[in-house]
Design a protein with these regions (language model features):
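Phosphate/pyrophosphate-binding betaalpha-module
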Residues: 51-111
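A C-terminal functional module that forms or caps the active site or interfaces directly
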Residues: 129-174
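Active-site/ligand-binding-proximal alpha/beta "capping" segment
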Residues: 108-144
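Short, basic, glycine/proline-bearing loop/turn elements
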Residues: 11-25, 120, 139-140
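His/Asp/Glu-rich mid-to-C-terminal helical/loop segments that flank catalytic regions of hydrolases
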Residues: 175-191
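General beta-strand structural signal in soluble alpha/beta enzymes
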Residues: 14-16, 45-49, 65, 116-122, ...
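Short, small-residue-biased leader/transition segments that mark boundaries at the very start
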Residues: 2-5
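Flexible, glycine/proline-enriched loop segments at strand-loop-helix junctions
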Residues: 16-27, 34, 86-96
Length: 191
């Protein structure tokens, strides 16, 4: 799980790293920690990731506040038996990224003089990077960044009634935007 700290009387759990579906883990395993955090009393989840930049008006190295995500092409992490102690069978997903927390992030960025992009995270389960055609499709569908994590955890957090705030480091330009191949090294350098 990670470490637990106390900050202003509140307990804060910090997780380092995550399991990914592309590593062979089931969605139940990928999202297990979110449910454990909820059972421990956590009511807010802050998620971060590094992802490819799909929006051609932006550049690698910028920070994006996640306003929503697209996860259409793989099964749901809620598939299977519903656990009513966490939430209803068919939860609403219209505000998974809590508007109030997004406003707090905007206010903080403004006070610090930081550029904070706002956009939609497009989930692909990998492990291969996306093709240029897939990136064009992601852009047409409204994606601003593309990555291989975050959406499953956020769906489960929403199911559990947790508030969510998400940030993406735009680590590289996505496939086909620049005339160069993608590499894991450029993602690791940025992140």
């Amino acid at each position: 799980l990670g470490d637990v700290y106390k900050r202003q009387g509140q307990k804060v759990a910090v997780m380092q790293g995550r399991m990914h579906h592309y590593e062979g883990y089931s969605y139940e395993e990928v999202t297990y920690a979110v449910r454990v955090l909820r059972l421990l009393g956590c009511d807010t989840l802050v998620v971060t990731n590094a992802a490819g930049c799909v929006n051609t008006d932006w550049k690698a190295g910028e920070l994006m506040l996640i306003t929503d995500h697209i996860k259409m092409f793989s099964e749901s992490p809620l598939r299977g038996e519903n656990l009513p102690e966490f939430g209803v069978r068919f939860p609403d997903a219209s505000k998974l990224y809590t508007p109030r927390l997004r406003q707090v992030a905007r206010d903080c960025a403004q006070k610090l003089g930081l550029t904070l992009r706002e956009g939609v995270y497009f989930y692909c389960y990998g492990p291969q990077y996306e093709t240029p055609a897939e990136i064009r499709a992601a852009r047409i569908l409204g994606g601003d960044a593309v990555g291989m994590s975050t959406a499953p955890e956020v769906i489960v957090a929403g199911h559990c009634g947790m508030e969510v705030l998400g940030f993406t480091l735009l680590s590289n330009m996505a496939a086909g935007i620049l005339d160069q191949p993608l590499s894991e090294e450029e993602v690791l350098i940025a992140g």
